[in-house]
Swiss-Prot record:
Family the UniProt entry places it in: Belongs to the asaB hydroxylase/desaturase family.
Alphabetic keyword roster: Oxidoreductase
Function statement: Hydroxylase/desaturase; part of the gene cluster that mediates the biosynthesis of aspergillic acid, a hydroxamic acid-containing pyrazinone with aliphatic side chains that originates from leucine (Leu) and isoleucine (Ile). Aspergillic acid has antibiotic properties and was shown to be lethal to mice.
EC number of the protein: 1.-.-.-
Induction of synthesis: Expressed during the earliest stages of maize kernel infection.
Listed name of the protein: Hydroxylase/desaturase asaB
One Gene Ontology molecular-function label: oxidoreductase activity
NCBIfam families noted in UniProt: CmcJ_NvfI_EfuI
Keyword Oxidoreductase: yes
Gene knockout outcome: Abolishes the production of hydroxyaspergillic acid and leads to a reduction of ferriaspergillin analog containing hydroxyaspergillic acid.
Pathway named in the protein's UniProt entry: Secondary metabolite biosynthesis
């Protein structure tokens, strides 16, 4: 497949060698001072061929979607009724996935988002890190992410065969679906794909910050049993 352009940049990976730090305290200086393994990479621009990529094969998918409400939200607009116990019992027996929806609120001026082809990023290149929620004073900042003391995260280690992609000049009517987890484990279906923002050298000096929204969705495939 031929892409119209590519970006030469560096991505920060988790170090593959040395002592393994298995826990981070979120929102603290220590989390930002952790060791990194910075590697030069090529990121391909899929603009014009974005329809080639799908969630179940590559782990990500670009879509067009015009939203009536982009820049503002109110609590009443996002509240949903709780499901019944019967519905919950049914869903627990079906295939399920976690899919993030990322979209810009304005045209992206800098620091675009890149995703890796799930087939090129092997399980051995992923490291599970526990993100611990900071003290009680700051915990409220993480209430939307967890009601507990923290949560697990996967960080990537570098491997030469990894392939990265992005779509240039994304607009608010364009969104990126990113698969974070899929219970279907058949050896063919993409189960997760790493993603990261990156510095495009051509827009490094742009002062306007990127404004974007990321929504995490719990998806149930009611026509497919839990494998």
């Amino acid at each position: 497949m031929r892409f119209r352009q590519q970006v030469e940049t560096c991505l920060n990976y988790w170090p593959a060698e040395g002592p393994v730090q298995r826990e981070l305290i979120l929102g603290t200086v220590g989390a930002y001072r952790r060791p990194i393994d910075s590697r030069p990479v090529l990121i391909q621009d899929v603009r014009g061929q974005e329809g080639t990529f799908t969630l179940d094969i590559h782990g990500f998918q670009f879509i067009k979607h015009i939203s009536q409400h982009v820049a503002s939200f109110d609590e009443a607009s996002v509240l949903k009724d709780n499901m019944t116990a019967l519905e919950a019992e049914h869903l627990l027996k079906t295939r399920w996935a976690i899919v993030n929806i990322w979209r810009p609120l304005k045209p992206v001026p800098r620091d675009p988002l890149a995703v890796s082809d799930a087939r090129s990023f092997h399980d051995k290149d992923l490291l599970e890190i526990y993100g611990r929620v900071p003290g009680r004073q700051a915990k409220k900042d993480y209430d939307a992410a967890t009601k507990g003391s923290g949560f697990g995260m996967l960080y990537g280690k570098y491997s030469p065969g990894q392939q990265w992609f992005y779509m240039s000049d994304m607009k608010p009517d364009e969104a990126l679906l990113i698969k974070c987890y899929d219970s279907k484990d058949d050896g063919r279906t993409a189960r997760r794909t790493p993603h990261t923002a990156f510095v495009d050298p051509r827009t490094r000096d742009v002062k306007v910050a990127r404004e974007s929204l990321e929504l995490r969705c719990l998806v149930f495939f009611e026509d497919q049993p839990l494998a």
